[in-house]
From Swiss-Prot:
The keyword Coiled coil does not apply. It is a lipid-anchor. A lipid is attached at C16 (S-diacylglycerol cysteine). One of its GO terms (biological process) is bacterial-type flagellum-dependent cell motility. HAMAP family: FlgH. Disulfide bonds: none annotated. The keyword Membrane applies. Pfam families: FlgH. This is Flagellar L-ring protein. GO terms for cellular component: bacterial-type flagellum basal body, distal rod, L ring; cell outer membrane. The basal body constitutes a major portion of the flagellar organelle and consists of four rings (L,P,S, and M) mounted on a central rod.
Amino acid sequence: MIKYIALASVVLLVGCSSTAKKPIADDPFYAPVYPDTVPTQVAATGSIYLDSQASSLYSDIRAHRVGDIITVTLKESTQASKSANNEIKKGSDLSVEPVYAGGKNISISGVPIDLGYSDSMNTKRESDADQSNSLDGSISANIIQVLSNGNLVIRGEKWISINNGDEFIRVTGMIRSEDINPDNTIDSTRVANARIQYSGTGTFADSQKVGWLSSFFMSDWWPF
């Protein structure tokens, strides 16, 4: 009977587990954004100079329109540490005075009746956790929206195929046009509401995942 209960518990745990959605290379959400094509009426004057193809010596070539490309320089570094100490002490004492009857101390085999009880408990827990991450590189992204206040919403991804797996970098966020460098780049630290994802798919990425049984032992469901 115990075997069947254990087997049923394992089946229920496996059934409750969820599988995360795997990223795909051609995700429509990260598809390139193209600017709207507006036909320009150009008068045929016979001149080799055309206003539609001219650019000023003082014009700004930095990205500022929907569909323009901007390069995000990834300079991310995070470090966190956490420690916790917890100590619980509990004690109780109970004593009963000698029992008297008729002015005499009641005893058993000459030993007076005297009850006493003492209990104490001491629990102490200590935990430390350290984590640090760094990400350096660059990725080009599209401007997908120009807000009314001039801020730009960007989005882009990069996929790299290596051996039996793929690695990808994705970035989304909001930037100010004033923070764009003259070479049309911007530091990732200047991206507001940034969502930067660096991961991979394939055999190497799967080998770094924790199995469902190990996840159970490290979850809150494990009583110990």
